[in-house]
Amino acid sequence: MSALIGYILLMTLMFSLAAGLYFGLRSIRLI
């Protein structure tokens, strides 16, 4: 059970990191 929670946390962390990088690069390009 704890392994599943850890996996979900890891996936959400990776997704948020990728989204942050993507939007960060887009905002830098717009400026």
Curated annotation (Swiss-Prot):
<dbReference type="Pfam" id="PF05115">
    <property type="entry name" value="PetL"/>
</dbReference>
<comment type="similarity">
    <text>Belongs to the PetL family.</text>
</comment>
<dbReference type="GO" id="GO:0045158">
    <property type="term" value="F:electron transporter, transferring electrons within cytochrome b6/f complex of photosystem II activity"/>
</dbReference>
<dbReference type="InterPro" id="IPR007802">
    <property type="entry name" value="Cyt_b6/f_cplx_su6"/>
</dbReference>
<keyword id="KW-0793">Thylakoid</keyword>
<dbReference type="GO" id="GO:0009535">
    <property type="term" value="C:chloroplast thylakoid membrane"/>
</dbReference>
<keyword id="KW-0150">Chloroplast</keyword>
<keyword id="KW-0934">Plastid</keyword>
<protein>
    <recommendedName>
        <fullName>Cytochrome b6-f complex subunit 6</fullName>
    </recommendedName>
</protein>
<keyword id="KW-0249">Electron transport</keyword>
<keyword id="KW-0813">Transport</keyword>
<dbReference type="GO" id="GO:0015979">
    <property type="term" value="P:photosynthesis"/>
</dbReference>
<keyword id="KW-0812">Transmembrane</keyword>
<keyword id="KW-1133">Transmembrane helix</keyword>
<comment type="function">
    <text>Component of the cytochrome b6-f complex, which mediates electron transfer between photosystem II (PSII) and photosystem I (PSI), cyclic electron flow around PSI, and state transitions. PetL is important for photoautotrophic growth as well as for electron transfer efficiency and stability of the cytochrome b6-f complex.</text>
</comment>
<keyword id="KW-0602">Photosynthesis</keyword>
<keyword id="KW-0472">Membrane</keyword>
<dbReference type="GO" id="GO:0009512">
    <property type="term" value="C:cytochrome b6f complex"/>
</dbReference>
<comment type="subunit">
    <text>The 4 large subunits of the cytochrome b6-f complex are cytochrome b6, subunit IV (17 kDa polypeptide, PetD), cytochrome f and the Rieske protein, while the 4 small subunits are PetG, PetL, PetM and PetN. The complex functions as a dimer.</text>
</comment>
<feature type="transmembrane region" description="Helical">
    <location>
        <begin position="3"/>
        <end position="23"/>
    </location>
</feature>
